[in-house]
Amino acid sequence: MEKKAWLICICCLCCMCGVSAPKKNNFSVKRGVNISHWLSQSNVRGENRAVFFTEADVKFLSEVGFDHLRLPVDEEQMFAPDGSKEKEAFSLLHNALSWCQKYRLKAIVDLHILRSHHFNAKEKPLFTDRKEQIRFYDLWKQLSQELHTYSVDFLAYELMNEPVADDHEQWNNIVAECVRTIRLLEPERSLLVGSNRWQGYETMRYLKIPENDPNLIISFHYYNPFLLTHYRAGWTDVKDYTGKVHYPGKLIADEDLKHLKGELYDKFAYWNKVEFNKEVIEKHFKEVVDFARLHQLPLYCGEFGCIAATPKADKERWYQDMIELFDKYEIARANWDYKGGFGIIEQGIPQTDLIYMLTGRNIK
């Protein structure tokens, strides 16, 4: 009788251990690209949306050496205001995932923009309105319901792109509840979690990682120096500078800087306080590398890149330094982006030098 009771006790303990320690999956990636302005940040619908990204694109990306796609999706494209699914958008998403499987690419579905949260919006109700938080968790329940049949070794989820909360704890609380919500449905799915304030390296130390979860991936974005990577970008606060930029070293030559007057001088002299080079980038990377090592979790740079207007030679030197550091610290990454303003395709033409730097594949 005592022996039987002991066996029952052991079985119960084993079951409890199984619940508290989910199995580590085999999701692993290295070189990817963002499929932007398709199911995210676009007003295009119907046939024009369908032909923007096709099987031929996935085949091309596989052939030139990428091993995964980051697929940004927006709430307004995937879900109607009443919360019901937009069938056409989900059909396109499933098409993309099936093409990835066909051409042996892995995928990350990134919930990019919510009706309650845009990374550049002034008001972000997600952090202050409990109803919006519940709606966010419900979106993930529906996404999980739709996507759970894909292998955990093939597909990962990114909770949300570039959170921007007034207080770091607001985002930490949402991360904890969102992870719990998904884990009830999918205990072994890889989930990507980034820090508050645009997933910057500067705020990584404030991110609270849910404990005892081996299938989390720490994500950050890197666009420094911003004046170089977003050179003349019309939606940014650096759009007014039209002079030359340089990398590495001082971003603006002293000779060019002295020609700026008044507020323009004060604004852009800031960028010359640091001579930007590989050593500076490595110092920034070390912050996220050390954080990931502390938590014994893989690290992923989900966005990095230079806009098309950035001078080619300076852009290529920046990319070369970035890639060398990614490789040195074994950081998986996805370039921003494919066909957009930072794209490896410009006006339909593959940027062969950039592709070679990103993947090591010469397609000339």
Regions found by a protein language model. Give the residues of each.
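Positively charged n-region of N-terminal signal peptides that target proteins for export
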Residues: 1-5
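Aromatic-rich peripheral "rim/lid" segments of glycoside hydrolase catalytic domains that contact
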Residues: 310-364
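An active-site-proximal structural segment forming one wall of the substrate-binding cleft
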Residues: 49-52, 58-68, 85-113, 120-156, ...
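Hydrophobic h-region of N-terminal signal peptides that target proteins for export
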Residues: 11-19
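Active-site region of glycoside hydrolase catalytic domains
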Residues: 130-275, 282-306, 328-331
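Surface-exposed, active-site-proximal loop segments in enzymatic domains
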Residues: 41-47, 75-91, 115-132, 314, ...
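N-terminal carbohydrate-binding accessory modules
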Residues: 19-68, 83, 291
